């Protein structure tokens, strides 16, 4: 389903843990990493597509996460010309995305990249919040920057509410 401007409706998913780190997934058989994302099917809402993609790509269900935020607007990126499939009709020149920020409520062990017969990812790790902006492929970088900027206050508030380990008072020797 491509819109009149040539953009495919899509959802993007940022999953964070209680420490404010985000899940960074490695594309199957590649050295590139990204957030989970996927197309919205006809008749499907963005939220329904997000839950479907969450299960297909990461193996998590509704009970494993909670929605913390979603982007106010659709965000777009253009594909590099070398990635556009010019022989398809209509031609898709890029993606328009609605992004969701989710908090993982289950254990990390619930994450399973192999639920689909054609997995999108073959690995994942927790990374610092801003890390993906510097590491994603260049044509997605502006969208990632905008998404992370929009979600930053929510994730930082989450970090502020995480109990911190108390360090033992430092031992000081009296002088004199």
Curated annotation (Swiss-Prot):
Cofactors demanded by this protein: a divalent metal cation
PROSITE patterns membership: NUDIX (PS51462), NUDIX_BOX (PS00893)
Top-rank lineage group of the source organism: Bacteria
GO molecular function: mRNA 5'-diphosphatase activity
Limits of the Nudix hydrolase domain: 6-149
Record flagged with keyword tRNA processing: no
Enzyme Commission number(s) of this protein: 3.6.1.-
Gene3D superfamilies: Nucleoside Triphosphate Pyrophosphohydrolase (3.90.79.10)
This protein's GO CC annotations: cytoplasm
Keywords: Hydrolase
Pfam families: NUDIX
GO terms classed as biological process: mRNA catabolic process
Motif annotated as Nudix box, chain positions: 38-59
Function summary: Accelerates the degradation of transcripts by removing pyrophosphate from the 5'-end of triphosphorylated RNA, leading to a more labile monophosphorylated state that can stimulate subsequent ribonuclease cleavage.
PANTHER family per UniProt: M7GPPPN-MRNA HYDROLASE
Similarity-based family: Belongs to the Nudix hydrolase family. RppH subfamily.
HAMAP family per the UniProt record, alphabetical: Nudix_RppH (MF_00298)
Name by which UniProt lists this protein: RNA pyrophosphohydrolase
UniProt source species: Salmonella arizonae (strain ATCC BAA-731 / CDC346-86 / RSK2980)
Phylogenetic classification of the source organism: Bacteria, Pseudomonadati, Pseudomonadota, Gammaproteobacteria, Enterobacterales
Gene label: rppH
């Amino acid at each position: 389903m491509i819109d009149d401007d040539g953009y495919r409706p899509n959802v993007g998913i940022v999953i964070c843990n209680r420490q404010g780190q985000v899940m960074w997934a490695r594309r199957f058989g590649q050295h590139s990493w990204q957030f989970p994302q996927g197309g919205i099917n006809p008749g499907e809402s963005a939220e329904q597509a997000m839950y479907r993609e969450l299960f297909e790509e990461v193996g998590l269900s509704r009970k494993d996460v909670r929605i913390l935020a979603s982007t106010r607007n659709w965000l777009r990126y253009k594909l590099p010309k070398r990635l556009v499939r010019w022989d398809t009709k209509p031609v898709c020149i890029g993606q328009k995305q609605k992004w969701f920020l989710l908090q993982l409520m289950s254990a990390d062990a619930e994450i399973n990249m192999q639920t689909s017969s054609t997995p999108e990812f073959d690995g994942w790790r927790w990374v610092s919040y801003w890390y993906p902006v510097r590491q994603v492929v260049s044509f997605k970088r502006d969208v990632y920057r905008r998404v992370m900027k929009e979600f930053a206050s929510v994730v930082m508030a989450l970090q502020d509410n995480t109990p911190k380990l108390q360090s033992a008072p430092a031992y000081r020797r009296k002088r004199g």
